[in-house]
Regions:
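GST-like domain detector, emphasizing the conserved glutathione-binding G-site
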Residues: 1-123
């Protein structure tokens, strides 16, 4: 069974989990940091060029990284490719709106907000 590795948070893996649920793609949703983080440290050494989480590891052991790349790859695998340009636009619009939410109003806001010790906002 494919594995989705991410922290025990919604975060950047939420869209992947939602797609897998909707497309009936069975995954093992795993927290590699459970316990002493040894599993995560071992994986990072095995795949040093893969960056941070989330990771999607398919049945043959291939490691996919970058949440949006994982999401788009799984969407193609699940048959969520639009032939109609308008439907494709709506699909991309939903995708990008979700990204905007994550960046501006979602879970990442507290980490970058001056109110929570993040950098001061600048007017452009």
């Amino acid at each position: 069974m494919p594995k989705l590795l991410y922290f025990p948070l919604h975060g950047r893996a939420l869209k992947i989990r939602m797609l897998c649920k909707h497309a009936n793609i069975a995954i093992s949703d795993e927290n590699p940091g459970k316990g002493d983080w040894k599993e995560w440290a071992d994986l990072k050494q095995e795949f040093p060029d893969r960056g941070g989480l989330p990771w999607f590891i398919n049945d043959d052991g291939k490691v996919f990284t970058q949440s949006d790349a994982i999401l788009k790859t799984l969407a193609l695998q699940a048959g969520y490719k639009c032939d109609d340009p308008w439907q494709q636009f709506e699909s991309e619009w939903c995708f990008e709106t979700a990204n905007d939410y994550m960046k501006k109003d979602g879970i990442l806001t507290p980490f970058f907000s001056p109110a929570f010790g993040g950098p001061e906002a600048t007017e452009e």
